[in-house]
Amino acid sequence: MPERYNRVLLKLSGEVFGGGGIGVDADVVSAKAREIAEIANSGVQVAVVVGGGNFFRGAELQQHGMQRDRADYMGMLGTVMNCLALQDFCEKAGVDTRVQTAITMGQVAEPYIPRKAERHMEKGRVVIFGAGSGMPYFSTDTVAAQRALEIGADALLMGKQGVDGVYDSDPKTNPNAHKFDELTYDEFLSRDLKVADATAVAMARDNDLTMVFFNLEMPGNISRVINGEDIGTTVHR
């Protein structure tokens, strides 16, 4: 792992925004926004992809009989609500931000344009990506990998809720689960690990994008990962 990443894509799940519940937990989002602002103000270029699971999950709605593409679009709109919440708290913490969405909604966000996102980051702004890929059937993990590649990020930081890395089985149900400090992409995929979408990991492998899985709940962990501290699990070639 390098001493310090210069440009990162941070993936935040919707569960983080909800603090484990439905809607937005202002205290939790405010705390993460302060961390992100501190990192951006230190000179690291930061982009964020946010999920919408605290509002809607397309796959779960499908299980209840809803058409999958419509359910996914509902999930995408949920991510935009999270984007706006994070934007507000980041700006209160002292860093300029821009929200870009894959579904056009000019009153609240810019359209997603990779080159424009890069220019924003070069100027010290945090760029927050919402509305997934703008298309159904794509997970937020896959969108995060795609966005990281499009903006030339040094690494994709996968902030996790309730787990501090990648394990060989679910540590919540198996007290003997083994945590990996490092994995290759192929090891991750061959073990069929469920902590991230396989399509996202395959995309990272094919383009040599480092992924770091870490516990987002621990204060200061985002900065620790960016500065090269050995926490979480690094997935690379």
Curated annotation (Swiss-Prot):
Enzyme Commission no: 2.7.4.22
Question: Where in the cell is the protein located?
Answer: Cytoplasm
Q: State the protein's name.
A: Uridylate kinase
Query: GO cellular component terms?
Result: cytoplasm
Q: Mainly resides where?
A: cytoplasm
GO-annotated molecular function:
ATP binding; UMP kinase activity
- Reactions it catalyzes: UMP + ATP = UDP + ADP
Question: Which keywords fit this entry according to its UniProt record?
Answer: Allosteric enzyme, ATP-binding, Cytoplasm, Kinase, Nucleotide-binding, Pyrimidine biosynthesis, Transferase
User: Per the record, a Pfam family?
Assistant: AA_kinase
Task: Specify the domain of life of the species encoding this protein.
Answer: Bacteria
Sites where the protein binds UMP: G52, D72, S133, G134, M135, P136, Y137, F138, S139, T140
Per the record, the gene is pyrH
Task: Spell out the InterPro entries in the cross-references.
Answer: AceGlu_kinase-like_sf, Asp/Glu/Uridylate_kinase, Uridylate_kinase, Uridylate_kinase_bac
Instruction: Name the SUPFAM superfamilies on file.
Output: Carbamate kinase-like
Role according to the record: Catalyzes the reversible phosphorylation of UMP to UDP.
Q: What are the GO BP annotations of this UniProt entry? A: 'de novo' CTP biosynthetic process; UDP biosynthetic process
